[in-house]
Amino acid sequence: MSSQRQLPAASGTVEIVLLDGGGFRTTEDWRLHEGGHSRPFFLYDWCFFIQHKASGRKILWDLGISKDRSLYTPSVLANQWVGANPVGPRIPLTEQLKAIGHDPAEIDTVIFSHAHWDHCRPLRSEFPNASALFGPGTIPYCRPGHIQNLEPTMASQWDSRFFSDDENVRTESCSELDGHWAPWGPFDAAMDYFGDCSFWIIQAPGHMPGNLAACVRHPSGEHILLGSDCCHSRAIFDGRSQIAVSGPDSTKLCLHLDLDAALETIEKLREAVNSYGMHLALAHDPEFIREVY
């Protein structure tokens, strides 16, 4: 008899497709892993297309990186772009979608796991009919963003095109997820987004306010957990490496705003995998491809 815990009965499924969101040509493994190296390596930045089987609705989970620098704030370009050395996908997201038979204009929602620039950017030019959704607490934390007195500034990394209170500045249709949150599996707060247990959005504290994970139910019946930046590598997830809390010169750093909460979230991800049989896909790690694909 299987010792795995059971999830509530589900009637729905979704199609999920891995999309190339670009990545980073960087030397800063030490930002991810305590005692990490400074050798050049490529850090992936995955995003996902999700289509609800019953309704036909098409959504995206994160957007990865764009080659268009105008989609980023001056603070991001000055403070994060150089060290990260980002590169966009080999094929733009819109063309990737067309290649699998989907019109970008049919995307009605982009759900951002969180508001960091390598996951989130203005979307109107690529997905004209899509609205953006963020986790609870994101908008007040990021408000008002980088534009002050109608001029871009270095004051904030957050993008006023999403977060400004001024309707003349805010160009993107966005809101926070608003609905019923309830315990599901090992998680304290999850939302049954389509109402048939095919796609759960999960509050995942630690990385930044409003941080999210998600879980999709594949037509095979398997569950794929989208861990995004809850955990930055499989090595950390497996306990082979620790989250970086200091740099090469012993300066304090951490990619998670609340490390204790992030560690609790990672433990819940482990429980989801080990006790509920879910498959884990992290935003910046390729190891899941061998398992899922």
Q: Residue ranges of each PLM-predicted region?
A:
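Active-site metal-binding loops of divalent metal-dependent hydrolases
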Residues: 21-22, 63-65, 115, 138, ...
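Active-site metal-binding motif and surrounding structural segment of the metallo-beta-lactamase
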Residues: 70-134
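A short helix->loop->beta-strand "cap" motif at the edges of active sites that frequently abuts
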Residues: 57, 127-131, 277-278
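Active-site environment of divalent metal-dependent phosphoester hydrolases
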Residues: 115-121, 208-212, 232-236, 285-290
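Metallo-beta-lactamase
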Residues: 4, 85-102, 106, 135-202, ...
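Core dinuclear metal-dependent hydrolase active-site scaffold
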Residues: 18-23, 35-37, 47-53, 57-59, ...
